[in-house]
Amino acid sequence: MVFLSWGRPSSEQQQQVINKTGTFNYDNKYRGVSSRSIAKLKEDSEIDKDGFLINHARVLVGSGRESYEKGKKALQNWKHFGMDWAFVDPATPVETGKKFCICVKEVLPWVMLPLQVVYVDESRKSRKGPAHFGYGSGTLQGHLLAGEEKFSIELDGNGEVWYEITSFSKPAHFLSFLGYPYVKLRQKHFARHSSEAVLKHVNAS
């Protein structure tokens, strides 16, 4: 089951997809695992043994509390999907259990990929100290891949603001099996464009 649209998917089309999807399409033991650090993910032999590939990107997008708050707001409003070839409905609330679609333009049709927010994580040690906001989403039945992806923004101890994407995934449909090298290239392409979108938002006046 693949969800396609010849035009830019409407909110109604996305809701129809969400209504048709069932549960997560990957093992329950991996639920929330994307919340771990990239080092711990790479140390987990089970992830590799079960065929998942890890993707990671971390980009400096600014400095100071104001930049961090802008970055946090960008993630809450899905600005990291602010591209002409990929988007999430910006009205989608970032809350645990919320189902949504990532809509991606592929050559001719758009593909609607269903996911569900698995967790939302926020921490702040003090009003002026380090802070972190992020959330992870898991793939649902009907997604071309199986796994999780985390987006996060961090204000570190040096006052620098970092945008980070961490995911582990594997093909969940014969189309993604056949075109997995292309899928991996698209993931890297997305990471670059997403980082540029967050950087643009953080540095906007």
Swiss-Prot record:
The organism's taxonomy opens as: Eukaryota, Viridiplantae, Streptophyta, Embryophyta, Tracheophyta
For this entry, the protein name equals UPF0548 protein At2g17695
Query: Where does it sit, as one GO cellular component term?
Result: chloroplast
For this protein, the parts annotated as crossing the membrane are none
Q: Which PANTHER family match?
A: UPF0548 PROTEIN (PTHR34202:SF1)
Organism expressing this protein natively: Arabidopsis thaliana
| Lineage: superkingdom | Eukaryota
- Family per record: Belongs to the UPF0548 family.
What Pfam families has UniProt attached to this entry?
DUF1990
